[in-house]
Amino acid sequence: MGALSKLAHSLGQPILTATCYETIHTWNPDCNGAFFDALPVGLIFSLKTYASFYLITNVVSKRGRLDKINWKKFGIDVCQSSLFLVTNMCFFLILLCKFRKWLGFFTPITMGLVSSILASGIAILVEKKSRRPALALYLINLASETYYRHLANHGYVTMHTYGECIPFGIGLMLFTWLQSIGRLPKSFNGFMNVALKSNVSENLINEKKIPDNFRLFLEKLRSDYKKTELCNHPHSCVSHSVESFAKNMTFGLTASSVLTVIRNVRTIIKNPLNLITLLVSKENLKLPLFAGFLPFIFNATRCSLNRVKYVPPVLNNVFSAGLASVAMAFYPTVSIAMYCLWKAIETVYFDLVDRGYLPKFKNGEVILYAITTGYVLWNAVVEPRAIRRGYLNFLFGLVGGKISLFNRRLYDHFGFVSRDVYTKIPEFDPKYAMINPMLYMPLVE
């Protein structure tokens, strides 16, 4: 231990000689006992999570036809994905204790970073190959957000209001650039046409299905204004922008209303009048406004620039997409923004691979998943406030709330901001401790 601790100090790594019991698994002094305490809860949680996930996926893909679902495959998928999640949790806890035992102390990186990377690398090999790229992309998304929050917690960067618009805008511009030069995969062309109404040559709204007053207004918009030679839409630029707004906002309002009702079923049952209040609330209108203004700003900008000479079409489309990203101010969502950014980067990468400019790494998704998940889980231990609240709640449920029982007062030694999410002081038997709790525990709670 002496030689290893000197090596750690020479590498700039402070050490903590506390045991894994008083540091991590304060609910049980025995490492194996602590592991078996967490296992049943994690297994049940994993089965519930993936049973719900695969059921929804199958119902949607089969359009509600339960008789068309392959229930045997459903059961296998649920068990395999649940085993993957439990494996990740188990190896994470086991390796935390093992590294403490092997070294005789903790350092910042052995407090969860190394063990979580190894655990995640082992676990992802259990999961289906078809799901690995999606999991890797999601965790890259989450890890990049966590890293930014981590830097913000220590004052290196600043959290900006509506900052979600920036990564969302970059992602949209990359997608639009690929679409403009004809290299966007077909599966994404549909998404772009739905989100931005970028390549629409037919009527967006069927005038036969709307009331007379609205039909007259729509016909006026279509006939009283003009469009440029560069525009592909069938009617005027004003009409196309307004129609794209109306159509997407209608879909957004429907989706938002359904989700609002599902989330507030109990409240509505207790008092049905609450339904009206919920549907006209500001929260319920955020998604529709975002969905509506996204194509409106894009098409209004693109049609305006089509009237300006010497503006290349590709530059026009890319700039319009970037400007349209300000629509996210109505519905600021980090998960959507980061997913759009990283999915666009992934699409550009594979385009460059296909054209021979970049190499394709075998099992690259396994490596990416291991590193990014390891970083996120490490932050769950040492600095939980850097993690997105939804994912932190997911981890909390996976381990049955035991993540809140870590003795984070000892982590102050490493300079982390650890105690502002889980403030409860853990109870443990001091006879198993190497550091006297009186040195850091408050005398009065």
Swiss-Prot record:
Question: What outcome is recorded for mutants in which this gene has been deleted?
Answer: Decreased longevity, mutants living for a significantly shorter time than wild-type worms. Reduction in fat stores and reduction in mitochondrial action potential.
Task: List UniProt keywords, sorted A-Z.
Answer: Cytoplasmic vesicle, Membrane, Transmembrane, Transmembrane helix
Q: Does the keyword Isomerase apply?
A: no
Q: In which tissues is it expressed?
A: Ubiquitously expressed.
Annotated membrane-spanning segments are: 36-56, 76-96, 105-125, 162-182, 278-298, 318-338
Keyword hit for Membrane: yes
Q: How the protein sits in the membrane?
A: Multi-pass membrane protein
GO annotation, biological process: determination of adult lifespan; positive regulation of gene expression; positive regulation of lipid storage; positive regulation of mitochondrial membrane potential; response to cold; response to food
**Might you report a single GO cellular component term?**
cytoplasmic vesicle membrane
User: What switches on its expression?
Assistant: Up-regulated following cold exposure and upon fasting.
Subcellular compartments: Cytoplasmic vesicle membrane
Q: Which domain of life is it from?
A: Eukaryota
An example Pfam family from this entry, by short name, is TMEM135_C_rich
Report the main location listed first in the record.
membrane
State the family it belongs to: Belongs to the TMEM135 family.
Briefly state the protein's biological role: Involved in fat storage.
Q: What is this protein called?
A: Transmembrane protein 135 homolog
Organism of this sequence: Caenorhabditis elegans
